[in-house]
Amino acid sequence: PYELTHQGVSFTDPKSRSWKYFSDIPYPGAPEHFDESFRIIAANIAADRSLATDLRAQLTTEAKASLTRYLAANPGRKTIRSHFEAVSSWAKANGIGPDRIFLGEFGVTRTYGPYKASPPQPLENWLGDVRQEAEARGFGWAFWALSGYGGMSLIETDESVAFDRPTIAALGLKSR
């Protein structure tokens, strides 16, 4: 779900432009997380003094709708499992072995330095759930990047060569 994986990322499309102001989005998510999550998003929008009043109102409305959709879906491991089971069924019906299914990217932006996005626990939960469900079916996977925009990477910060330990742990990798 992009509301989780791309929180803090700037988009121009009206359906996703409010995601720039998303941060601290829970995963797993549920409707009862709405009030706290929306309070954080609304505060992020209000803090952007570059926005005209009407645009601020539009972004708040768009963010509310997007967050509502995300949380109403109850995103969690069960959701991932359901999607991966559908892929497994399709592959089996078409004579494609699980070793030929490759998950090429499933990163999450994270909070550090100038970036305001996911805190460690939701990021670890998401990465761990996706990786474990893929591995349980024999699917291959790769992570987005060694370093890169908004912490969607294995490296701790933009200026660092040190691994981000929560990311490494969630991926089942070991670092020295």
PLM segments and residue spans:
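Aromatic-rich peripheral "rim/lid" segments of glycoside hydrolase catalytic domains that contact
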Residues: 112-176
